[in-house]
Amino acid sequence: MNLLDNWSERGSDLSEFEAVVKELDASTHARKMKLDDLKLLSVFDADKDYVLFHTYDREQWQSKCAPKVSRLGLTAPSAFTSNMDLVNELINRSKLLINYGRNSYLTSSHLSRDLGDCARLGGDSIYNPTEERDRYLMSCFCVNGAAVRSKSMTKYLASKQDCVTVYRTKDGLAKIFSMAGGAYAYLPQSSLVDVIKYFEGELGEVDCRQWYVDHFFTQIWVEFPKKAEDIAATYKLPDIIVPGLLFETSDTRDCSYTCTATYRIGTRKCYIAGDSYSRKHIGTVNVEQIADSIKKKVYATYTRLPERLCALMTVDIDNPRETVCGILEKAGLKANSPRGVGKIYGKKILDDLCGFINPAETYTGYDIAMQILSLPEMISSDEKQYLVETLRVLCGNAIFLDFKEFDKAEPVGGGITLLPV
């Protein structure tokens, strides 16, 4: 791990994931700070020898004097000069150091959003790291702080003058990645491993499909092959259903603590999304509480899905193309639907899917469901990942619609014009 904003790691081994998140946790700290006690050091010049800052703090705000000039030397050996990539990131991207007490912190360029939230400011300009922005931010912190001390601010707004700063340390340097409200509760990311091991005891052997970690987002997808064997023995479906769990979290306010039930058909690479559980980073919680909440929220997917597929095996479909189009349109695959995927992609998706359907053959609802569930696999690629994510949810919902409602020779809903019948 390093402190650069663009640091990331990925893999498919659970033990490697555990090592990465434990290293991340060991370097991560949460500290409560008062906003008007911050010192914002805004970069205004730099050369090969120095980085120059203007300092904005409560003293400067109260006196209305010109900001003090500080400098960071780049010639003598130091924690900074031993990592020039971080210095270059400071000069060219974040352009801000924060001092609090006796400590100095680098800042992530992603911190702009949080600084704006703390000052109750919005708009695009908050993301432009300039002296003018930093000066105005500090003035907001000071005005609000003065209102708190004079007791002219409501208790709710006063509570927002405290922030929980999440920072990481490495090689003698510290860098702030997030500033959250005072109610924020830091939850170590290694808790994901503890929850996964809990479900290993519940569902059997764990197979880690893939994981990804960066400073702002963590994701891991695991499956349970033994549970797949149990489902196969119980329901005797033509295709193997492999259940899994997708965990996502962030300690920088970019994602809630989320767990989504997944299922994958046979040897396909893409999963379909089922029920999900999510909680904000507030309050106190332990692994057992999280695991119990996940069980209550997502376990139903593992019985509801195979039961639905069993029922669809007894449903005969006379008009497979019209049925597929009607189901997907109702589920949200519409050019003018906010839940849809757009006119161009919608047409291509339906054209591609219906290309696999032979009107001369006999189809059951199960066959149609398998075609629908193949959609994310058909278009899975990095440049269309957002589309894959949409279809994972859309297709998972689609198979629970009434298939016979759409098994008609005529187009549904005023005419489906995305492909010829």
Task: State what each model feature region is.
Residues 184-421:
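Intrinsic disorder/low-complexity polar-acidic segments
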